[in-house]
């Protein structure tokens, strides 16, 4: 839907309606990031997904609230949450699946020093207990400072991070 030009909120609403109409109890979680690669301005759409974090040095800001995932109902309480973002130089946006415990992830992010996106993702995934049978994924978004310069043309990117959750719950 996004590649066809639909707005992110409209695409999420359509996805929700499809899941509800199927009526098989399946659902997924959604993290969708739209960001201008030159300015860092953008939005993060969250729906049923684990919290995300904005990290700069030892400062960590939790992003997102608990919301039911798409497919479990309709109405205002069953909508994607849109969070406006302005990614700055040196900031890292951390997206995770629910297989990574929130408390352990947040503690690690506050304690670790400056790391490359690859090192940070590996550390976040290591926060999860190996005994829990769940997916453990971390995506780190960090804009390259060299590309963050004012231009007359705008380059936008969309990152989709979806996780298919349980069916028949």
PLM regions and their residue ranges:
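Conserved active-site loop/cleft motifs that coordinate metal ions or position small ligands
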Residues: 94-96, 137-142
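Short active-site-adjacent structural elements
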Residues: 102-106, 147-150
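Catalytic core of PPM/PP2C metal-dependent serine/threonine phosphatase domains
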Residues: 1-57, 64, 80
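A short, conserved beta-to-alpha structural element at the edge of catalytic cores
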Residues: 115-134
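Short, charged, surface-exposed loops that flank catalytic or proteolytic processing sites
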Residues: 4-11, 111-119
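Activation on terminal intrinsically disordered regulatory regions flanking enzyme cores
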Residues: 139-169
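Catalytic palm active-site di-aspartate
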Residues: 15, 135-136
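Acidic loop->beta-strand submotif enriched in PP2C/PPM serine/threonine phosphatases
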Residues: 25-30, 62-105, 129-133
């Amino acid at each position: 839907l996004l590649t066809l030009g639909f707005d992110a909120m409209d695409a999420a609403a359509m996805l929700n309606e499809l899941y509800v109409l199927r009526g098989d109890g399946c659902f997924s979680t959604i993290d969708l990031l739209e960001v201008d690669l030159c300015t860092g301005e953008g939005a993060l759409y969250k729906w049923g997904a684990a919290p995300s974090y904005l990290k700069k040095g030892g400062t960590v800001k939790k992003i997102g609230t608990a919301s039911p995932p798409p497919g479990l109902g309709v109405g205002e309480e069953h909508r994607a949450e849109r969070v406006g973002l302005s990614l700055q130089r040196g900031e890292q946006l951390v997206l995770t699946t629910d297989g990574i415990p929130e408390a352990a992830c947040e503690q690690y992010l506050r304690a670790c020093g400056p790391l490359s996106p690859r090192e940070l993702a590996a550390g976040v995934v290591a926060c999860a207990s190996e005994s829990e049978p769940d997916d453990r994924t971390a995506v780190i978004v960090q804009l390259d400072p060299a590309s963050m310069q004012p231009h007359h043309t705008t380059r936008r990117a969309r990152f989709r991070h979806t996780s298919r959750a349980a069916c028949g719950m």
